[in-house]
């Protein structure tokens, strides 16, 4: 928590900047599909492993050896704790600034559920022809922003189509227009960045 707050102090200028509406904390963090094997591979003195053992004990589950199924039940509380700690740090260091999540790209559905109640806006990097967020439940009352996208073309600049390729600048413009239209058509999306 103290590291989060210390790093946020570097952005103290944002408190009074009328153009800074919010802040992302992280970018495309690696979230495994299953947390059990990840926790089991951590050294015994790692904070996350210590937290997991403590939680298993609290739940009356065996801890030696911890069962993968039991560890999986900790994924949602782990994600909730992550987003909650980030939100608390933003509120303490940058009051009045929206917390925009961590710009997820890939990751399990637990991310959207775990972010509910902590993020002001759920951010997701979508390198596709249209916006989407499979992590956030359809019925969740949370705004979503597409925090990164990419449409490359081979006719100018770097000779690579990049993450979402187009043949030329015209197709690139049409791809972006389609992408933006898909965001406008989905009431959950509040913008693209």
Model-predicted regions and their roles:
Residues 5-12, 87-91, 180-184:
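Non-transmembrane alpha-helical segments in soluble domains
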Residues 17, 116, 186:
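Acidic-histidine catalytic/liganding microenvironments
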Residues 20-22, 26-27, 163-193:
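Substrate-binding cleft of secreted/luminal carbohydrate-active enzymes
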Residues 2-6, 81-84, 169-178:
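Well-ordered, non-membrane alpha-helical segments in soluble/globular domains
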Residues 16-112:
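Polysaccharide-binding and catalytic clefts of secreted carbohydrate-active enzymes
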Residues 26, 34-41, 150-153, 159-163, ...:
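Aromatic/acidic polysaccharide-binding cleft in carbohydrate-active enzymes
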Residues 1, 68, 157-164:
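Surface-exposed, active-site-proximal loop segments in enzymatic domains
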Residues 73, 77-88, 92-162, 181:
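Glycoside hydrolase catalytic-domain groove-lining segments
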């Amino acid at each position: 928590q103290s590291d989060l707050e210390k790093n946020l102090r570097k952005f103290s200028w944002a408190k009074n900047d009328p153009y800074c509406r919010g802040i992302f904390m992280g970018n495309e963090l690696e979230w495994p599909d299953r947390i059990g094997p990840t926790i089991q591979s951590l050294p015994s003195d790692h904070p996350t492993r210590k937290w997991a053992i403590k939680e298993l004990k609290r739940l009356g589950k065996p801890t030696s050896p911890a069962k993968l199924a039991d560890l999986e039940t900790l994924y949602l509380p782990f994600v909730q704790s992550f987003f909650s700690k980030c939100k608390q740090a933003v509120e303490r260091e940058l009051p009045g600034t929206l917390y925009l999540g961590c710009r997820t790209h890939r990751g399990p559905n637990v991310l959207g559920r775990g972010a509910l109640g902590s993020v002001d806006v759920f951010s997701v990097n979508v390198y596709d022809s249209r916006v989407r967020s499979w992590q956030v439940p359809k019925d969740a009352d949370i705004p979503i922003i597409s925090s990164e996208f990419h449409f490359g073309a081979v006719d100018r600049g770097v000779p690579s189509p990049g993450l979402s390729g187009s043949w030329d600048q015209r197709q690139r413009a049409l791809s972006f227009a389609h992408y933006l239209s898909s965001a406008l058509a989905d009431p959950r999306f509040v913008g693209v960045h």
